[in-house]
Swiss-Prot record:
Belongs to the DEAD box helicase family. DEAH subfamily. It comes from Xenopus laevis (African clawed frog). This is Putative pre-mRNA-splicing factor ATP-dependent RNA helicase DHX32. Residues 263-439 form the Helicase C-terminal domain. One of its GO terms (molecular function) is RNA binding. Its main location: nucleus. It catalyses: ATP + H2O = ADP + phosphate + H(+). Keywords: ATP-binding, Helicase, Hydrolase, Mitochondrion, Nucleotide-binding, Nucleus.
Length: 748
């Protein structure tokens, strides 16, 4: 029987009382041997005696700014269903609040479930789980664990789970009311990712259906008022970080903010003042440039200044490359000053304690989706006031840190107050597919904090219709349901389903993993261009980049099957200018996709890569999902005009066709981005006839008149006319084999 509210309140009061006395005992017994304390106290989470490290970390935790609100927070949690917490970076919010919620659930004997805490970045989720397991004196992967894309480090016994907001959103497809959790914590709300906003909206509904569920929303001070109102005047608990910070502004905007930031960095280093430095740049490309520049300059510096150690912190980098804490320290006698280079999205990844200086260029480059041209543009714009204020919290709380703003103070006053929510500036097709899976019909009436752009919603619905993911009533079709099972872009999911019909599942799973993982090609400086060409040339496939990626993965997998050591595999990657981390990620993704295929009982086929028939089948599968991404070379020089609009793009430098004597006339591309040099990435040659065979007639007829469209109709052979066909495609089976196909596609 569920515990009553009065019983919960009594347990919480006892918990708070016990916590206070425990803390007093630890303080008063500082001279007592650790073994004596261990004999007295048992960890309530695993029943084992506390280690001496637990008490050491407890004293560190008590110094965190967030610790001051612990008992106030627990009291609000006991008496309210939804609690909003306002706290800045490095306050301890992400590590301490989940532990307090675990204590709350422990007091209630886990009657209503465990605790889950979402993070905006997978790196943060992994590191926080490890750190919190250490602080709670329990085992990672047992009492405390994490779930991130393509990695699950939890068991049924886990009482505190860290995960990305995307993973919790996907869990809702099989567990709509999140019934396995007693407390749901949404952290880093200010990032305003699409999955974050979707969770915030759904939790309002779930809270009504589950009165026993507790919801904790953690955000920055600037957004707390909005969230309090959004959740019907929910109680607000504020953790103030009051340490002094000196802000230094420039008199005018620098012409070159990038080099101005580097000059200031070197000036600080020459003063010999102690402390590490964080530099916020506009984009990841600038992080790479700054890293190489600092490495070169450091070689010529006076050794008496101490070593300058740059750390490139990419928000979307691999977990294995991420070192967030004192692990960066070493035992060297020579002083080292760490310089963290990151972007605005890297704020929550910075955990170093000794940061005395922050340099902020005040500019960021954001990817904004343009519905008209179906492409992302890299937009340069000033940061928001929320970002500007949060820079101060990065500085060490024990010092009088300095924040150098490379913009005038009046420029700061003109910044927009909040970050733009991602639901207002990204492609919404994956979100709409999820909402349809959750039986949300009136998309325009979903209660988001910021409403998505109606045009973006309409285009997402239209694209899902073209992909045969919707039936005639606008609900998910059988294909749409299966597509939603994959953690992929719907177009890629559709290509995998088509591969089931064309007997090339093995190759499509490999390709899906390679395009989902980070770029496998390493960026080399211009002087190493020849080495780059030799490395990539071995894997080049004349049909295009999709096939080149399959070649690369197959070679890498062959090394693994031959039981090569990790050193040999990494050396092989280095010799061919490939990223070992990216290929490892692709392998993990492929295994996850293979597990999904088996779980929903989709047909699998063995490898057949290399034959002409297999190449054609792969192209057919790709066209089934990417028929909206076709381009034609207009001048024989690699300038491609898109079929869906009149934008022109060039081949990406990583494309194998860049080094070919002749470029193909018609190509299918994976991605088109608008920037200083608009590029199409991952392209393969196709024939107009093959395209006309697989393009949905109602999509082709809706295309605006153009020369490219006319050429496609003229080049069409008599045996492949664009005749009207049934509205819904059946790529998994032939029309006369319906009964068999239904047995092959089962959602469990």
């Amino acid at each position: 029987m569920a515990l009553s509210l009065e019983a919960y309140e009594q347990d919480i009061d006892e918990l708070i009382s016990d916590e206070k006395s425990c803390c007093l005992d630890v303080t008063d017994s500082s001279d007592v041997e650790g073994d004596e304390l261990n004999d007295l106290e048992l960890n309530p989470f695993d029943g084992l005696p506390y280690s001496s490290r637990f008490y050491k970390l407890l004293k560190e935790r008590e110094t965190l700014p967030i610790w001051k609100i612990k008992y106030d927070f627990l009291e609000h949690l006991a008496h309210n269903q939804i609690v909003v917490v306002s706290a800045g970076p490095k306050s301890g919010k992400s590590s301490q609040i989940p532990q307090w919620c675990a204590e709350y659930c422990l007091a209630g004997h886990y009657q209503h479930g465990a605790v889950v805490c979402t993070q905006a970045h997978k790196q943060t989720a992994v590191w926080l789980a490890m750190r919190v397991a250490d602080e709670m004196d329990v085992n990672i992967g047992h009492e405390v664990g994490y779930i991130v894309p393509f990695e699950n480090c939890c068991t049924s016994e886990t009482i505190l789970r860290y995960c990305t907001d995307e993973m919790l959103r996907r869990e809702m497809m099989s567990n709509p009311l999140l019934s396995s959790y007693g407390v749901v914590i949404i952290d880093d709300v200010y990032e305003r990712f699409v999955s974050t906003d979707v969770l915030l909206s759904f939790l309002k509904v779930i809270a009504v259906s589950r009165p026993e569920l507790k919801v904790v929303i953690i955000t920055c001070p600037s957004l707390s008022g909005t969230l309090v109102s959004y959740y019907g005047n929910a109680p607000l608990v504020e953790a103030e970080n009051t340490h002094s910070v000196e802000s230094v502004y420039t008199t005018s905007l620098p012409r070159d903010y990038f080099h101005s930031a580097l000059r200031l960095l070197f000036e600080i280093h020459h003063t010999k003042e102690k402390g590490d430095i964080v530099v916020f740049l506009a984009c990841e490309e600038e992080i790479k440039r700054a890293y190489e520049h600092i490495k070169q300059e450091a070689l010529h510096m006076n050794p008496e200044l101490g070593e300058l150690m740059p750390i490139a912190l990419y928000p979307h980098q691999s977990i294995s490359d991420y070192i967030p804490y004192e692990e960066l320290d070493d035992n060297s006698k020579n002083p080292k000053r760490k310089v963290v280079l990151t972007t605005s999205l890297g704020e929550s990844l910075i955990w170093m304690k000794n940061i005395f200086f922050v340099i902020d260029v005040g500019i960021e480059k954001r990817k904004v989706y343009n519905t008209r041209i179906r492409a992302e543009s890299l937009v340069t714009q000033p940061i928001s006031k929320v970002r500007a204020k949060m820079r101060k919290h990065i500085l060490s709380s024990s010092s009088e840190g300095k924040l150098f703003c490379l913009y005038p103070e009046d420029f700061a006053h003109e910044m927009k107050p909040f970050l733009t929510a991602k639901v207002e500036e990204c492609n919404l097709i994956s979100m709409v597919l999820f909402l349809k899976r959750m039986d949300i019909a009136g998309l325009a009436h979903c209660d988001f904090i910021n409403r998505p752009d109606p045009e973006s919603l309409m285009q997402a619905l239209e694209d899902l219709d073209y992909l045969a993911a919707l039936d005639n009533d606008g609900n998910l079709s059988e294909f749409g349901i299966i597509m939603s099972e994959f953690p992929l872009d719907p177009q890629l999911s559709k290509s995998i389903l088509a591969a089931c019909e064309f007997d090339c599942v093995d190759e499509m799973l490999t390709l899906a993993a390679m395009v989902t993982a980070p770029n496998c090609f390493i960026d080399l400086p211009p002087e190493a261009k020849e080495l780059d060409l030799i490395g990539k040339g071995k894997f080049f496939h004349p049909e295009g980049d999709h096939f080149t990626l399959i070649n690369i993965y197959n070679e890498y997998e062959q090394m693994k099957r031959n039981n090569a050591s990790q050193y040999d595999v990494e050396k092989w990657c280095q010799n061919h200018c490939l990223s070992f981390v990216a290929l490892e990620m692709a392998r993990a993704i492929r295994n996850e996709l293979l597990d999904i295929m088996r779980r929903i009982e989709l047909p699998l086929t063995g490898p057949a890569f290399g034959s002409d028939e297999n190449v054609t089948n792969i192209k057919k599968s790709l066209l089934s999902g990417y028929f909206m991404q076709i381009a034609r070379d207009v001048d024989g020089l690699g300038n491609y005009i898109m079929l869906t609009h009149k934008q022109v793009g060039q081949l990406h430098p990583d494309s194998g066709f860049c080094n070919s004597a002749k470029v193909p006339e018609w190509v299918l591309f994976h991605e088109f981005s608008v920037s200083e040099r608009s590029c199409i990435r991952i392209v393969s040659e196709i024939s107009p006839n093959l395209f006309m065979e697989f393009v949905p007639p109602y999509y082709f007829s809706n295309l605006p008149p153009s020369e490219t469209k006319d050429l496609l109709q003229q080049d069409q052979t008599p045996d492949t006319p664009p005749t009207e066909e049934p509205r819904e495609e059946e790529p998994l089976h032939e029309a006369n084999d319906e009964g068999t196909a239904e047995q092959r596609c089962i959602i469990q």
